[in-house]
């Protein structure tokens, strides 16, 4: 136990804590999936996430019942008095997934008290005449201007902005 605790403390304090200090000095926001789902890593995930300005988890679009750490990120935010609980969102969303399916995932994350999404997307789309364009080395990053529903997706994004804004106004509940 002592060795594991020492390693967890070093990762939390000397790595994530040091990065947060450097970001503070530079005036840079710092969000991190601090140790995340690194199950083989000797760490205290709540402690590590508590050392960063914005604790972050992630949820994937293809594993709707996956082992996500979004509740861990929101718990760290609550325990350590942080207003933002962040999540990498919609990782590996496919072109065949509808906005309704993605909204269900968003609602799942909001229920876990996540109030900031960092959308996993491929904004790099250099070609104007090739579809689906660059999808990120075989990954299914469909959340970009080349998706056929993109021009109709504004209400989807507005909904998420409203939910995140509303959640940041309140206080977490148990």
Language model feature labels by segment:
Residues 1-174:
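Carbohydrate-binding surfaces of carbohydrate-active enzymes
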